[in-house]
Amino acid sequence: MHLSHLLAWALLLTLLSLRAEAKPPSPQPQVPRSPGDEASEAVAANGGGKKGDKEPKGDRPRLLRELRLDTRSRGSRGVWTRLLHDHPNPRKYKPANKKGLSKGCFGLKLDRIGSTSGLGC
């Protein structure tokens, strides 16, 4: 019995390793370009910066792109932390404050219809 389990696991691991080797690596997904990137590249190409800038012209669009990606990842990170660390809202589980509930003749709560119609007692 143990030998058959061992052989089954070995076969499974072999098949998984062959499957991983047979698959060519997937190309990196291209980030869709927005009009803002094209505009910033055009400004950088035309020398839109100050003359005293020490940054090369090609670094500015890359920095802008990285900044935009960083803000996206920060926003998604906030969503994940909220989902994973969702503390229950105490007001959500607290029953509504019901003022003016009258007691019936025998100490039981009257329902809304019984209290308004006067048929409770």
Swiss-Prot record:
A GO CC term attached to the entry: extracellular region
Entry-linked Pfam families: ANP
Signal peptide: 1-22
SMART domains according to UniProt: NAT_PEP
Modified residues (D-leucine): L84
Single GO MF descriptor: potassium channel activity
Compartments in which it is found: Secreted
Biased amino acid composition, Basic and acidic residues: 50-70
Entry keyword set: D-amino acid, Hypotensive agent, Ion channel, Ion transport, Neurotoxin, Potassium, Potassium channel, Potassium transport, Secreted, Signal, Sodium, Sodium channel, Sodium transport, Toxin, Transport, Vasoactive, Vasodilator
InterPro entries: C_natriurtcpep (IPR002406), Natr_peptide (IPR000663), Natr_peptide_CS (IPR030480)
Name recorded for this polypeptide: C-type natriuretic peptide
Organism: Ornithorhynchus anatinus (Duckbill platypus)
